[in-house]
Amino acid sequence: MIGLLYRAADRLRRRRYPENHGRIGEDLAHRYLRSQGCTVVARNYRTLAGTGEIDLVVWDGGRLAFVEVKTRSSTDFGPPESAVDAEKRDRLRTAARDYVRRADVDWKAVRFDIVSVILQASPKIEWLRGAF
């Protein structure tokens, strides 16, 4: 019975729905950044006002990086990071200001990164430090 539940859960996890892509990409990015020596301090951080969300907040050396994770199954419509347009960058900056204010961090120590994930048989992960 338990084996059947595990197989069913695995099938659900592997479905190719966009909401699953995002979650899988965030999980891969989280593990990747940790493997690169980052300390993850927040996942899916939401502002108190509910006006924004940041996928990952990490310390990379002495820099606090606000990380947007973008995931696609292919590059047919461009690389994942191309989805981070000016409007999205503005929302991320607003959410980052909220985090910095609450965490009492110097804004000069802040950086904005993008982790691009392409889900293939062997996922491709690219970390764009200081992307904007």
Swiss-Prot record:
It comes from the Bacteria. GO terms for molecular function: nucleic acid binding. PANTHER family: UPF0102 PROTEIN YRAN. This is UPF0102 protein Acid_2433. Transmembrane segments: none annotated. InterPro entries: Restrct_endonuc-II-like, tRNA_endonuc-like_dom_sf, UPF0102_YraN-like. It comes from Solibacter usitatus (strain Ellin6076). Belongs to the UPF0102 family.
